[in-house]
């Protein structure tokens, strides 16, 4: 497998509904080796190689779980909602990246009320995501807005891609960036004039 391509795909931000970065990487990879690339109205693409024989499609979804900004408070903290399936306790203290409407990436971290400010009962209960916030180092709502962050901006989790041992990789969104990388590699390497091979990058799994 092309580990360099897989790393590029995993490190891209592509929360469901905002798959542009992954799509651009795949299109740039596939354009030299396919006959045609078409798009649908939602942002999925279909790359075709060949034009006769049985049709074979390999599909990988480009999106990942993430968050969306729902509110900016007067102290400069971002409130958010989840996109996709999340276990609340895995979110706290996670580093994230906010992608603004202009494509600027702003780092942040998911926080909550400090433990010493919680009651004993609260300390025994898991936090829900609506008790958390994202801190981007701003001191006010005005400072957040000056940086270009708006309600509706997408937020992706941050995780470093790494190779462990001889045959393991770790990173975010491996489901299904591995599928996308395999799809691209098949289109690059399979040369069978007896089939029509399609590679599909789908959105909003």
Where are these regions (language model features)?
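N-terminal hydrophobic/helix-forming segments and targeting peptides
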Residues: 1-205
């Amino acid at each position: 497998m092309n580990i360099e391509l897989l790393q590029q795909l995993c490190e891209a931000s592509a929360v469901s509904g905002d798959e542009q970065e992954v799509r651009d990487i795949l299109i740039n990879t596939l354009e030299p080796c396919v006959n045609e690339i078409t798009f649908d109205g939602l942002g999925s693409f279909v790359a075709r190689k060949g034009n006769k024989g049985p049709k074979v499609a390999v599909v990988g979804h480009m999106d990942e779980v993430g968050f969306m900004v729902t509110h900016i408070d007067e102290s400069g903290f971002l409130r958010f909602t989840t996109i996709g399936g999340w276990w609340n306790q895995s979110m706290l203290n996670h580093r994230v990246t906010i992608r603004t409407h202009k494509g600027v990436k702003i780092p942040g971290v998911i926080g909550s009320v400090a433990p010493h400010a919680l009651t004993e009962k609260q300390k025994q209960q898991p936090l829900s995501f609506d008790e958390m916030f994202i801190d981007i180092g701003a001191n006010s709502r005005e400072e957040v807005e000056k940086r270009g962050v708006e309600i509706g901006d997408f937020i992706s989790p941050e995780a470093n891609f790494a190779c462990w041992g001889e045959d393991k990789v770790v990173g975010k969104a491996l489901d299904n960036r591995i599928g996308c990388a395999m799809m691209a590699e098949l289109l690059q390497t399979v040369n069978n004039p007896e089939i029509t091979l399609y590679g599909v990058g789908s959105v909003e799994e």
